[in-house]
Amino acid sequence: MEDLTKNIIFTNAINGQPATIQYQTADGTILKQPKIEGQKTEQQPTFYYTTNGNGGTVNLAQLATTDDNKTCYIAQPVGGYNYALVNGMPLNQGAALGIATVDAQGRIQIVNQNKPIAANTISNISFKCDVCSDMFPHLALLNAHKRMHTDGEQQQQQQHNAQAGGDSIAVVSAQGLVQAQNIIGNGQMGQIQIVSSDTLEPVQQSVMQQQQHESKASKCINCGSSMLQQSKRKGPKQVRCESCMQAEQTAQQQQQLFVAQDGQMAHPVQIISTTPQAQAQLQQIVAAQTGGTTPKREASSGSGHHPVKKRNSQQMTKCQKCNGSGVVLVGQHSHASHSGVGGSVKQSVTVKTENPSKPFSCNICGGLFSRYSSLWSHKKLHSGEKNYKCSICGLAFAKAVYLKNHARIHTGEKPYKCQTCGMQFSQSPHLKNHERTHSGERPYVCGVCDKGFARHATLWNHRRIHTGEKPYKCEICGSAFSQAAHLKNHAKVHSGEKPYKCEICSAAFADRFALKRHRGIHQKYGQTAPRQTSSDGMIVHKQEIPDMEDEAQQEVIIGGL
């Protein structure tokens, strides 16, 4: 049996037919077994689905090996050949979810084979820290939170896991995905939970299914231990204990989960190696394949070509026969090496989101876009690519429009004017943010404490109150801060710099908030004129104070300033 177990293939259980295990040998011979349960398998086999309708084979996942029991998730379509289990994508309506586990002896077990998918929206998508189990609405926020775990120890994390209790479940990660997607036109989505690792690329994700539990304010949402809440504490409530906030990041072996194939041609999928060399080659393939443009016309559906399904004007393409991973392609792609027929072969699929006007979703931060070209341009912000450089100061930008806006700093141009107060701004977003100071609008709301903010950047900084993240560290004393501005102000304590001066008494301060508090002293006494020194050395503020009899100038003397 060990010599034959190269792949384990699940056939689609359409019309109530039971799933069947298949062993694929090195020469391509497929041996079938009537049952899955109890079969011996390799340490890291690859699971497949084949559909009875067209014979297409799909690579769904490899088993993870994070604990004694290995687990993978299988999206089972009903009445069709489209299926996927990826970030933010709906499963086919009426689909069932099968969970296959492998015990320490390598025996396959099936549980919840026909568990129905809950009808939920994309709002159920969340990102879970694999160290402390905290939940976050965006992957970028999770990655920022996980920096706080880098100095911990694995033993401490194991203690917290023991306190948390509950059923442990292995994680299947998605490597090499450019844009996880499902081509189902209409469908319902389950509560899919994303688990990320710093060792993965931003586009790589882990997918697991888990029921979400309500957190209690008086207990740590991670380990369940009681927390002492300060009754007079202002701001958001603390949701995690100090021990969990200092837990370390643990290494977790990640396996592969790819977008399900969509096609009417049988195409066996090969096992993809997880060695560094193989993964580097896969990343090169992904980078090379995603540099094209959106196709504008359909290819012929003749011999040697994939069928084309035109959904709308905003499309992407996906090759079933290149590298066996189902990686999404953009633009035209030659398949002469596959079919022996030259030319372009395109298979179009559409990313579906909950917003019909913005069907393209960023799988890193959750941003929505109306065009794929906008999404592609947006992802440069995450990759760090900056091809547009200022010829004056040398700063580089990810988009041409960012460079254009930056150039106004040098030219002094401020074309955007507030209709209420007349203030002018160099960029349109700055004007919109300013206008909210007049309207009182606060459209950016924190999902934890429901506090609203006028600017998205302010909300982003506010979230660190809940995550406990303090990524900005003083190199002199080691103090850490949640915001760069706080570190900048703190650095003035060491340098002695006090750039903020009072225009009334010339007192200097390190930050503008201290200056603002100081000005309140002058406002309390009605002081508006610059100070002077009297003959006896006391500080004198000259001010015109109206009197009932006359309006002569009077001197207000304040000692000690």
UniProtKB/Swiss-Prot annotation:
<dbReference type="GO" id="GO:0009047">
    <property type="term" value="P:dosage compensation by hyperactivation of X chromosome"/>
</dbReference>
<dbReference type="GO" id="GO:0000981">
    <property type="term" value="F:DNA-binding transcription factor activity, RNA polymerase II-specific"/>
</dbReference>
<dbReference type="GO" id="GO:0140463">
    <property type="term" value="F:chromatin-protein adaptor activity"/>
</dbReference>
<dbReference type="GO" id="GO:0003682">
    <property type="term" value="F:chromatin binding"/>
</dbReference>
<dbReference type="GO" id="GO:0008270">
    <property type="term" value="F:zinc ion binding"/>
</dbReference>
<feature type="zinc finger region" description="C2H2-type 3">
    <location>
        <begin position="388"/>
        <end position="410"/>
    </location>
</feature>
<feature type="binding site">
    <location>
        <position position="129"/>
    </location>
    <ligand>
        <name>Zn(2+)</name>
    </ligand>
</feature>
<keyword id="KW-0677">Repeat</keyword>
<feature type="binding site">
    <location>
        <position position="145"/>
    </location>
    <ligand>
        <name>Zn(2+)</name>
    </ligand>
</feature>
<keyword id="KW-0804">Transcription</keyword>
<dbReference type="Pfam" id="PF00096">
    <property type="entry name" value="zf-C2H2"/>
</dbReference>
<dbReference type="GO" id="GO:0045944">
    <property type="term" value="P:positive regulation of transcription by RNA polymerase II"/>
</dbReference>
<feature type="zinc finger region" description="C2H2-type 7">
    <location>
        <begin position="500"/>
        <end position="522"/>
    </location>
</feature>
<keyword id="KW-0479">Metal-binding</keyword>
<keyword id="KW-0158">Chromosome</keyword>
<feature type="zinc finger region" description="C2H2-type 4">
    <location>
        <begin position="416"/>
        <end position="438"/>
    </location>
</feature>
<comment type="subunit">
    <text>Homodimer. Interacts with msl-2; promoting recruitment of the male-specific lethal (MSL) histone acetyltransferase complex to chromatin. Interacts with Nelf-A. Interacts with NELF-B.</text>
</comment>
<dbReference type="GO" id="GO:0000785">
    <property type="term" value="C:chromatin"/>
</dbReference>
<dbReference type="InterPro" id="IPR036236">
    <property type="entry name" value="Znf_C2H2_sf"/>
</dbReference>
<keyword id="KW-0862">Zinc</keyword>
<keyword id="KW-0863">Zinc-finger</keyword>
<dbReference type="GO" id="GO:0005694">
    <property type="term" value="C:chromosome"/>
</dbReference>
<dbReference type="GO" id="GO:0000977">
    <property type="term" value="F:RNA polymerase II transcription regulatory region sequence-specific DNA binding"/>
</dbReference>
<feature type="zinc finger region" description="C2H2-type 5">
    <location>
        <begin position="444"/>
        <end position="466"/>
    </location>
</feature>
<dbReference type="GO" id="GO:0001228">
    <property type="term" value="F:DNA-binding transcription activator activity, RNA polymerase II-specific"/>
</dbReference>
<dbReference type="GO" id="GO:0006338">
    <property type="term" value="P:chromatin remodeling"/>
</dbReference>
<keyword id="KW-0217">Developmental protein</keyword>
<dbReference type="GO" id="GO:0160021">
    <property type="term" value="P:maternal-to-zygotic transition of gene expression"/>
</dbReference>
<dbReference type="GO" id="GO:0010468">
    <property type="term" value="P:regulation of gene expression"/>
</dbReference>
<dbReference type="GO" id="GO:0035363">
    <property type="term" value="C:histone locus body"/>
</dbReference>
<comment type="function">
    <text>Transcription factor involved in X-chromosome dosage compensation in males, the process by which transcription of the single X chromosome in the male is elevated. Binds to the DNA sequence (GA)n. Clamp-binding promotes nucleosome depletion and chromatin accessibility, thereby allowing access to other transcription factors.</text>
</comment>
<dbReference type="InterPro" id="IPR013087">
    <property type="entry name" value="Znf_C2H2_type"/>
</dbReference>
<feature type="zinc finger region" description="C2H2-type 2">
    <location>
        <begin position="360"/>
        <end position="382"/>
    </location>
</feature>
<feature type="zinc finger region" description="C2H2-type 1">
    <location>
        <begin position="127"/>
        <end position="149"/>
    </location>
</feature>
<keyword id="KW-0539">Nucleus</keyword>
<feature type="binding site">
    <location>
        <position position="132"/>
    </location>
    <ligand>
        <name>Zn(2+)</name>
    </ligand>
</feature>
<feature type="region of interest" description="Disordered">
    <location>
        <begin position="290"/>
        <end position="315"/>
    </location>
</feature>
<dbReference type="GO" id="GO:0005634">
    <property type="term" value="C:nucleus"/>
</dbReference>
<protein>
    <recommendedName>
        <fullName>Transcription factor Clamp</fullName>
    </recommendedName>
</protein>
<keyword id="KW-0805">Transcription regulation</keyword>
<dbReference type="GO" id="GO:0003677">
    <property type="term" value="F:DNA binding"/>
</dbReference>
<feature type="binding site">
    <location>
        <position position="149"/>
    </location>
    <ligand>
        <name>Zn(2+)</name>
    </ligand>
</feature>
